[in-house]
Amino acid sequence: MSSIETRLCHYDEIPDPGSKGLVVEARNTLTRVFVVKKDQQVYAYENSCPHTRGPLDWVPDRFLDEDANYIMCANHGALFQIGDGLCVYGPCKNDRLRALPCTIRNRVIHAQL
């Protein structure tokens, strides 16, 4: 099945560094996603831990560790690299978050779902 480009949010809605969680609809299905902005780059992922399949955040829009160097799963503290979603610490080490290719047009972030 081919992917569908979906509008996520405006680029300026996310601090740098920072993150934002969203629920988006594509093909009549709701999907939890989140966007991370760091050093003016944006990365989008499905909001699902590879270990438990539950959401990574326990506080809305809080996906990064205290130093904003890693994406962190609030359930068990797993740490994921921001740029590629690779788990570098925790029970799902070496697994990856599902990355969603994203683009920015007219300061609006879109992702392929």
Positions of PLM-derived features:
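Short cysteine clusters
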Residues: 49, 73-76
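Short beta-strand His + acidic residue motifs that chelate non-heme Fe in jelly-roll/DSBH
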Residues: 80-81, 89
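Short cysteine/histidine-rich metal-coordination sites, predominantly Zn2+-binding motifs
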Residues: 63-71, 87-95
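N-terminal pre-ligand scaffold of iron-sulfur
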Residues: 1-66, 81-82, 96-113
